[in-house]
């Protein structure tokens, strides 16, 4: 998303620490956390989403993980208060149920190791409006497609706490702990975690960095990377410098590893050209797959009304870069699709960005 800077504190950062309202809300967070047996970040998320009405927020917390209004066709199933819900087993709403059979087919393929899938998505955690419903919307897609890896950008602490509760089947690695940050989620049953590394961007003005995670999948060594490169047209120079650092780190990864970068690059095509394009051994997955029109634009203010921008902007901010292992092409990109194209009950989309679902064949 095009932002000039990120908050150094939570959604109430505009209030001074000494104001009575701030103290009152802090006490409410403590009370909520005590009743719900959750941490303060989760308490703040639920209270803020429910206009700081304690009873309403608690009711929201203890309701089914998927809203009843969006799942009338299935039997009601309440989870125990404070219990951890496995994201991969959580039922989803009717608005995307038509895709379930496809998801089931993919799950079977994933079990035999022949397919590797991931999602990359800027989830716009900095937009506090309808945050909880939008988080549920994102999670419904994660549940439906059950990807092996998830790359996220613009995560905030309450959203991270929500994901930890809902996605117990994933290991979550974050790029930082405060403000807003990136995250990589690894399906524990499929992806073996080895190590992680955070590479700072020395001249960023927006708390940006490069998150790298080394893993293995079906005997294949992978280096996974994500970032949220500097935003807005006015910061193009810094963004291009960060992009060059990403390419350098992809080149430096061990030759035995397949390298995948997926994230919100904020790049314009002419900026890639100014940087000299991509190295010969690194490809842009969208271009490699023939530049499919249906998933070209991931930030589209004509189709996506979340920001309320009058101008029609269509940009391919979210990109996937791929470097095959030197020993041979054991993992090959196969398809790319957009996610999050349907409005939620609140009348908004899960994010101002569309998500990207990428599937790759694994040659066993």
Swiss-Prot record:
Subcellular location: Nucleus; Nucleus, PML body; Nucleus, Nucleolus; Cytoplasm
Entry-annotated residues carrying Phosphothreonine: 88, 92
Compositional bias per record (Low complexity), positions renumbered to this chain: 1-10
CDD domains (UniProt xref): TDP2, UBA_TYDP2
Top-level taxon of the source organism: Eukaryota
Annotated region (Disordered), positions in chain: 1-21, 68-108
Cited InterPro entries: Endo/exonu/phosph_ase_sf (IPR036691), Endo/exonuclease/phosphatase (IPR005135), TDP2-like (IPR051547), UBA-like_sf (IPR009060)
Cofactor binding note of this UniProt entry: Binds 1 magnesium or manganese ion per subunit.
UniProt KW Acetylation keyword: yes
Post-translational modification: Ubiquitinated by TRAF6.
Binding site for Mg(2+): 124, 154
EC number: 3.1.4.-
Alphabetized UniProt keyword annotations: Acetylation, Cytoplasm, DNA damage, DNA repair, Hydrolase, Isopeptide bond, Magnesium, Metal-binding, Nuclease, Nucleus, Phosphoprotein, Ubl conjugation
Gene Ontology CC: one annotated term: cytoplasm
Catalytic site positions: 264 (proton donor/acceptor)
GO MF, one annotated term: magnesium ion binding
Cross-link (Glycyl lysine isopeptide (Lys-Gly) (interchain with G-Cter in SUMO2)): 23
BP-aspect Gene Ontology terms: double-strand break repair; neuron development
Pfam families, per database record: Exo_endo_phos, UBA_4
CC cofactor: Mg(2+); Mn(2+)
Ranges where the record places region Interaction with 5' end of substrate DNA: 122-126, 228-233, 266-268
EC top class, as a word: hydrolase
Positions of the record's site feature: Interaction with 5' end of substrate DNA: 180, 299, 317, 353
PANTHER family attached to this UniProt entry: TRAF AND TNF RECEPTOR-ASSOCIATED PROTEIN, TYROSYL-DNA PHOSPHODIESTERASE 2
Family: Belongs to the CCR4/nocturin family.
Stated name of the protein: Tyrosyl-DNA phosphodiesterase 2
Source organism (scientific name): Bos taurus
Organism phylogeny: Eukaryota, Metazoa, Chordata, Craniata, Vertebrata
């Amino acid at each position: 998303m095009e932002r000039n800077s990120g908050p150094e504190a939570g959604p109430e950062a505009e209030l001074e620490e000494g104001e009575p309202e701030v103290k009152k809300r802090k006490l409410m967070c403590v009370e909520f956390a005590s009743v719900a047996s959750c941490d303060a970040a989760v308490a703040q998320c639920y209270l803020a989403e429910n206009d700081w009405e304690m009873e309403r927020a608690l009711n929201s917390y203890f309701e089914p993980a998927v809203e009843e209004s969006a799942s009338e066709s299935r039997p009601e199933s309440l989870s125990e208060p404070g219990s951890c819900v496995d994201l991969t087993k959580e039922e989803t709403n009717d608005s995307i149920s038509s895709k379930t059979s496809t998801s089931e087919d993919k799950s079977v393929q994933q079990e035999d190791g022949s397919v590797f899938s991931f999602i990359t998505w800027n989830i716009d955690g900095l937009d506090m409006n309808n945050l909880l419903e939008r988080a549920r919307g994102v999670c419904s897609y994660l549940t439906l497609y059950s990807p092996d890896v998830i790359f996220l950008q613009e995560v905030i602490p309450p959203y991270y706490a929500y994901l930890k509760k809902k996605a117990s089947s994933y290991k979550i690695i974050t790029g930082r702990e405060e403000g807003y940050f990136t995250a990589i989620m690894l399906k524990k049953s499929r992806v073996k975690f080895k190590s992680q590394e955070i590479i700072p961007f020395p001249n960023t003005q927006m708390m940006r960095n490069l998150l790298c995670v080394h893993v293995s999948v079906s005997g294949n060594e992978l280096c996974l990377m994500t970032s949220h490169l500097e935003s807005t047209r006015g910061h193009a120079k810094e963004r291009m410098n960060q992009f060059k650092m990403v390419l350098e780190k992809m080149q430096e990864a061990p030759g035995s590893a397949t390298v995948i970068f997926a994230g919100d690059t904020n790049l314009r095509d002419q900026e890639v050209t100014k940087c000299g394009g991509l190295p010969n051994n690194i490809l842009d997955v969208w271009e490699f797959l023939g530049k499919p029109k249906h998933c070209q634009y991931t930030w589209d203010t004509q189709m996506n009304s979340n920001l309320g921008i009058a101008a029609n902007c269509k940009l391919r901010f979210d990109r996937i870069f791929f470097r095959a292992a030197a020993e041979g092409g054991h993992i090959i990109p196969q398809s790319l699709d957009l996610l999050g194209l349907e409005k939620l009950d609140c009348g908004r989309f899960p994010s101002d960005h569309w998500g990207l679902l990428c599937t790759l064949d694994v040659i066993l």
